[in-house]
């Protein structure tokens, strides 16, 4: 197989023409490929595939990441806030979807909905793109296109703007999900889990060499998850089918391809309403106020390929492409008004369908070079993304009246309907980028970079009954996004860092002339100290940040102070500042932790109030620890954790819903029965705290957190 290492490199020109196919695995060849181990060829490069998968290195920590850097870099050398969630951590916590994981990740806030349909926030802003192996696609909670974790080796999370490689993403940052890779030797596993509310999870994962010399390798993962929770009728069935292959085309050329197909079949819930004064209902946590006929169905097929080449005289080039096809339909019933003193409210019905065809492409080249007696590095490249979608909608504002204390979800059936509108939207962006890491002195690295972007948006809304159309277009040419950072090594283990990053976010709101508003512009300044301890097995970070969001669309008013319908001005400003502390990895040989604290202060300087900011707690703490009782019982692990937040709220039309601060405790036991067999038992919300994880309006989206619940699991590994 081809192994990439960090060395000095030269420029290359690459071309790619790939076709995707997946052959049946051939485990018997593993013994033959083992004899080839001594023939491994080492070439010099710095690509994604030069990093060992986290499932091989084990534990809760890795020493490097690619998110926000394009080429792998040590966490200590990236001048931004990075968290990497490893395969061990994901499996031990029984996470199925990325939004489940986010609920326990330091610095992130999840606006819960159905698992796989929740919004994820960082520093007050929602992640609106997710990367697979570095290539983006939209992340839209309501459409259910968040990837599951069965096919994922690790999740890399960056907080704060990522304008150099994601110039039109939100200010919160970027999430990069690195997919599992084929193994050279035959290996595999089967996992089964069962828990409260008839939750269950089944997974089979196998991989190995597909020819005698190990130059063709494959892997296949299939998983089914039924993620029910305490809410009646709220079924949530997810399927994942993943196949990937790697081809050593030569000693220095690696081709990788994958197909990822996912399905979701959900009976959705929008939570509970509240009383008109914002006080919450006193009802069972299992209360469901939708229709038993409600349904959400989604199918997503993701195809990707990457070609990497390294030359003995230096230089690594990579070309990657990704295509995603997503198809979703939703029929949902939910409350549409505050509850009166007798428990009465109304129901509304909404239907929606969404089709997406998203493509992304990236070509980059990286090289180390000597400067002033030290090794510096640059990366240059180009990328392109195109997001095309059609969305059909229908809404019946009030088609039934109910009493929340005496309601039968089977009494309401799906009404007859036809879609009333279709929105066709195409977004595209072409970018050129470059970044140089200048190692001017042995302890000092200065990072400079810039991106030039060309952006186009076309949106057409059609009234289906009449065929009437209204269109919006917007474009930006040659938009420059700068980037700067510095890392100063205090010692081999500790480094100070600082960075400045920027993004611009196009808006669809229009001014009084019918023109789209100029883009929002986000700027962030961040500084802190990072440490890599115990030979990189423990990573810590302390950081402070200041983020400014300008040109936000705000309601326009006439001279009399009366709001002008459908008219906005780019006058909104928000300033966010905060502190983050994090420790990830081994505290001792047998003791691991994933711990973080975040303070977030959001100040809306001008413009309209954004209620989502109220829902971000000022203080949040996430702690998890795992201890191997090797001195007492070999193979026995005990785990425990706490998530704690200060109060949060949601205000609309002068009415506020509120949840006070709380702390939740979880526990786990894991026992390695043999080298190949493992049993687990997890307890969540150990003390059965009753709380609203999400607060919304008086109409909907007030959602109870899960009561105390358990999950038992068993894994068998083939070696």
Regions flagged by a language model, labelled:
Residues 306-312, 316-332, 489, 495-497, ...:
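Membrane-embedded beta-barrel scaffold of Gram-negative outer-membrane proteins
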Residues 225-229, 242-310, 323-356, 399-425, ...:
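Acidic/polar loop-and-plug regions of large Gram-negative outer-membrane beta-barrel proteins
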Residues 110, 119, 135-159, 178-179:
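Short acidic/polar hinge/loop motifs at secondary-structure boundaries
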Residues 246-250, 260, 356, 375-377, ...:
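Structural signature of Gram-negative outer-membrane beta-barrels, strongest in the C-terminal barrel
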Residues 643-651, 670-719:
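C-terminal beta-signal and adjacent terminal beta-strands/loops
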Residues 303-326, 348-462:
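Face-selective signature of the C-terminal outer-membrane beta-barrel domain
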Residues 150-153, 164-243, 249-253, 301, ...:
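Outer-membrane beta-barrel translocator/receptor signature
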Residues 442-443, 569-652, 687, 713-717:
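Gram-negative outer-membrane beta-barrel transporters
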